[in-house]
Amino acid sequence: MRQELIERFTRYVKIDTQSNEESHTVPSTPGQIEFGKQLVEELKQIGLIEVTMDENGYVMATLPANTDKDVPVIGFLAHLDTATDFTGKNVKPQIHENFDGKAITLNEELNVVLTPEQFPELPSYKGHTLITTDGTTLLGADDKAGLTEIMTAMNYLIHNPQIKHGKIRVAFTPDEEIGRGPSHFDVKAFGASFAYTMDGGPLGGLEYESFNAASAKLTFKGNNTHPGTAKNKMLNASKIAMEFHSQLPAEEAPEYTEGYEGFYHLLSLNGDVEQSKAYYIIRDFDRGNFEARKNKIKQIVEKMQEKYGEENIILEMKDQYYNMLEKIEPVKEIVDIAYDAMKNLNIEPNIQPIRGGTDGSQLSYMGLPTPNIFTGGENYHGKFEYVSVDNMEKATHVIIEIARLFEERA
């Protein structure tokens, strides 16, 4: 299995599948379509049936049940795209067998070094086989590690029919990194009662709480005149934007929060005297606090509109996704099975809230409760990204054990 994981993963990461937020096509980039087509062929070769790829690039397939028991249909999902934060073109994965726990020089020429000082978890991987970047790109373990693990688990189950399981559906989705993953996902066609995204990080990660999320776009309009004769005439849009921002709690920002704490995050601010635009994201685990945060923004805007004119401050706010805990709690047994699967494999489950969202956040509200499971990667979205092959192997066995436990408990 180990060599199969390495071969499959290193092949996948060399395919450029970065999504593109500016694009209006589905999926947002052609690389995802090409990758999807390759996965369709590979799924067929492995022996899965009902292998499809729709016009939006969603790949689905079935591993038929090999038991007479009435087992719920379960699904495993991963996403095709990689993050937009750093280049994902020409990825050159580097394999480090029996890692010594010390600093790894990723790129001598550019002096890119993965150090324990910067990444304190690094020495804990001593003895593992690590796959890193060459220091010039991201790796794409998010989420090609998940794709690799699902493929490898399906192949293993086909070749080990003594492991009894119900019907399993797999799906590979585009554009997760730009928040559009579930936008065109056909829950009915997928036909699973529950699913798991293989899209987590380090060993043991089991996540079924996510942020409630909203975005706020603010447009501030000013009036530009010659600064020499501007008294009582000029209205500086950039200053109005700064005034707005100053009324948000400074300590409730990503750089000051952790755990279950929510925040307001100014993603971008640009403009001039005539017009300025600010883009925020609002995040909180608690629905009441989430609504209160949105109301605070509305109240600040309304107060400032009284001062500067309604037409000069325009707010566009929309909800993005909600905390999946609300939809997963009624079917908590799916979390319990994943927990027990890890325990059976001597993996200590690490249950943490996701300070972000996964496809599962939205899918859970679309009728497909979907917790998230670790894949074995670290430092996603940048040149210091790496993955432990040892922990990819463990994640693959978690998939297999979940399938076995669902059948055993049916």
Swiss-Prot record:
InterPro entries: ArgE/DapE_CS, Bact_exopeptidase_dim_dom, Peptidase_M20, Peptidase_M20_dimer, Peptidase_M20B
GO molecular function, one term: zinc ion binding
Alphabetical GO biological process terms: peptide catabolic process; proteolysis
Record's keyword annotation contains rRNA-binding: no
This protein's UniProt keywords: Aminopeptidase, Cytoplasm, Hydrolase, Metal-binding, Metalloprotease, Protease, Zinc
Localization per Swiss-Prot or TrEMBL: Cytoplasm
Gene3D superfamilies with a match to the protein in the record: 3.30.70.360, Zn peptidases
EC number: 3.4.11.4
Coiled-coil ranges (or none): none
Entry cofactors: Zn(2+)
Active site: D81, E176 (proton acceptor)
Similarity field: Belongs to the peptidase M20B family.
Protein's job: Cleaves the N-terminal amino acid of tripeptides.
Name listed for the protein in its UniProt record: Peptidase T
